[in-house]
């Protein structure tokens, strides 16, 4: 835990303030109305071993479920890092891969070291993950940036643990970029819970949304003058994952700046 009680209190007050705003916000948008919104990728680096992380997990859940920011379609990734696992509790959702992804952002933002909770919005802004006010501002700003168009179509395969996915990625004509950008595909799972027995959150029941299960680079985004990219992928699921809680997330990310140029999310086809 790297932050003082004063900072924790500030984060809590901000969360309460946003929660009040959320209660007055519109109901969650249907898939048809979501198309009128600009996709914004919100990543939360978190851990079940970090005492300041549960409020950030709650904030991400509210952002993802209520979609309270006008003009923004919030696409969440909850990424559990593994460097807290030495403190008495091993986070079963953690991965060294997510720790490495966070370190790339640390280098990009010229930070001194990684910390939790950390929220990163569209790869362009970062802040303490339980700060609702900063989250709202960053998401609003991101929703005004032009994005490349992405669509996802899923078709159930013969086996229950495989999903065929067709991805369409538009060219980067609308995005202000001069550098190569990669196409990534992720699987996330909602509704995960843990009864923490040790560490800073001992005795707490923690709930998670959009927990990152897998993440793979699957292609290179088409340049401004190129034809749209069409990819067909087979996405594998573990039998322990609940299919009804799974989403497939696709996003385009610049290699150097790590800016997100476009994103999309779809439920796994039954």
Model-derived regions: residue spans:
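Bacterial N-terminal signal peptides that target proteins for export
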Residues: 1-11
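Short, conserved sequence motifs used for protein processing/export or organelle targeting and
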Residues: 90-118, 124-270
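Hydrophobic h-region of N-terminal signal peptides that target proteins for export
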Residues: 12-21
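Generic anion/oxyanion-binding catalytic loop in active/binding sites
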Residues: 14, 39, 124
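Active-site-proximal cofactor/substrate-binding loop regions of enzyme domains
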Residues: 21-115
């Amino acid at each position: 835990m790297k932050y003082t009680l004063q900072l924790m209190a500030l984060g809590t007050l901000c969360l309460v303030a946003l929660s009040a705003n959320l209660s007055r916000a519109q109901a969650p948008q249907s898939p048809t109305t979501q198309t009128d919104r600009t996709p914004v990728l919100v990543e939360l680096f978190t851990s079940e071993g970090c005492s300041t992380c549960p409020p950030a997990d709650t904030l991400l859940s509210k952002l993802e479920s209520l979609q309270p920011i006008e003009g923004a379609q919030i696409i969440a990734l909850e990424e559990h890092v593994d460097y807290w696992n030495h403190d008495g509790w091993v986070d079963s959702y953690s991965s060294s891969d997510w720790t490495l992804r966070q370190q790339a952002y640390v280098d990009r933002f010229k930070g001194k070291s990684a910390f939790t909770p950390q929220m990163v919005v569209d790869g362009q802004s970062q802040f303490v993950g339980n700060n609702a006010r900063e989250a709202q501002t960053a998401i609003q700003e991101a929703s005004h940036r032009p994005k490349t168009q992405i669509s996802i179509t899923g078709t159930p395969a013969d086996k229950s643990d495989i999903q065929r996915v067709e991805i369409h990625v538009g060219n980067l004509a609308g995005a202000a970029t001069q550098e190569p950008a990669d196409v990534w595909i992720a699987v996330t799972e909602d509704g995960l819970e843990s009864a923490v027995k040790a560490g800073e959150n001992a005795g707490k029941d923690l709930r998670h949304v959009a927990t990152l299960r897998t993440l793979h680079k699957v292609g290179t985004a088409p340049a401004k003058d190129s034809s749209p990219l069409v990819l067909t992928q087979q996405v594998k699921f573990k039998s322990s994952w609940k299919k009804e809680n799974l989403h497939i997330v696709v996003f385009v990310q610049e290699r150097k700046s790590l800016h997100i140029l476009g994103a999309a999310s779809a439920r796994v086809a039954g």
